[in-house]
Regions:
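Disulfide-rich extracellular domains of secreted proteins
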Residues: 27-248
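Bacterial Sec-dependent N-terminal signal peptides
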Residues: 1-29
């Protein structure tokens, strides 16, 4: 067994957050705690994508912020009638010539602002036929989706009393074993059905907070040929405003 000598410490603070209204004071709603921590000869890669934009399939390259528009729609690239949104991202092999490269940990996060429409004092669901803590996942080399359920709902605004601003939620799923079983863990990761508010979002405080939603894959990999590192992945939830955004 090779004893690892750590020559420096690398900590990855994974902050899954949604930018919300400017009137609310910045607060940590779910304390950030380690989900993974190890000393390995390896590193981390991350990919992800949005689920809301100006058009369902076109790239937005304008000068304005996406969430400032009042008619944002779901991104939907898959032509699959069973999905209401979908997007993908390519995770490339950082060391394609390293035959010793192994997958250590892979986590999938998804998050969105999920405030419904207030009808006679009752807030509707944005996707009444879908559970927000489920998504559809298509891994590299696959041609069909698998529906997965979150290992943990890190935070959900709708569970708070009173509701918090734009009803954000954050979910996480450990997909390490599924990725390890692939012939090639690198390639296109595609996610569908991240529930989120479309169009225009007015917070519970009657401010324009903007729509938001997306997903992220975090992969920790290792190889005897890489440097020794201490890698720690944190997750939690904090409200972030333009004036108060320092969580050090």
């Amino acid at each position: 067994m090779k004893i690892l000598k750590t020559n420096y410490t690398k900590r990855l603070l994974l902050i899954i957050f949604l930018l919300i209204g400017f009137s609310l004071q910045a607060q940590v709603k779910k304390v950030f705690t380690p989900r993974y921590s190890a000393s390995i000869t390896g590193d981390v890669k991350m990919v992800g994508n949005n689920m809301l934009s100006r058009t369902s399939t076109g790239s937005y390259n304008g000068e304005q912020d996406n969430h400032d528009f009042v008619d944002n729609v779901y991104v939907d690239i898959d032509s699959d009638a069973s999905t209401f949104n979908s997007s993908s991202a390519n995770l490339t092999n950082p060391y394609p010539n390293d035959s010793c490269l192994q997958i250590e940990k892979v986590l999938l996060y998804w998050a969105a602002a999920d405030k419904g429409i207030d009808v006679a004092g009752i807030e509707t669901e944005n996707q009444p036929n879908w559970n927000y803590n489920n998504v559809k996942l298509m891994l590299p080399g696959q041609t069909t989706y698998t529906t997965i359920n979150a290992d943990e709902v890190i935070y959900r605004g709708k569970n708070q009393n009173p509701h918090i601003n734009n009803d954000p939620y954050v979910c996480v799923k450990d997909i390490t074993n599924s990725v390890k079983n692939l012939g090639n863990p690198f390639g296109k990761y595609q996610v569908a059905n991240v529930e989120a508010k479309t169009g225009f979002l007015v917070s519970h405080e009657n401010t324009n907070t903007g729509t938001s939603g997306g997903w992220q894959v975090i992969m920790v990999y290792k190889s005897d040929k890489l440097k020794a590192r201490n890698i720690t992945l944190f997750d939690g939830y904090a409200n972030v405003t333009s004036s108060q955004n320092n969580f050090d």
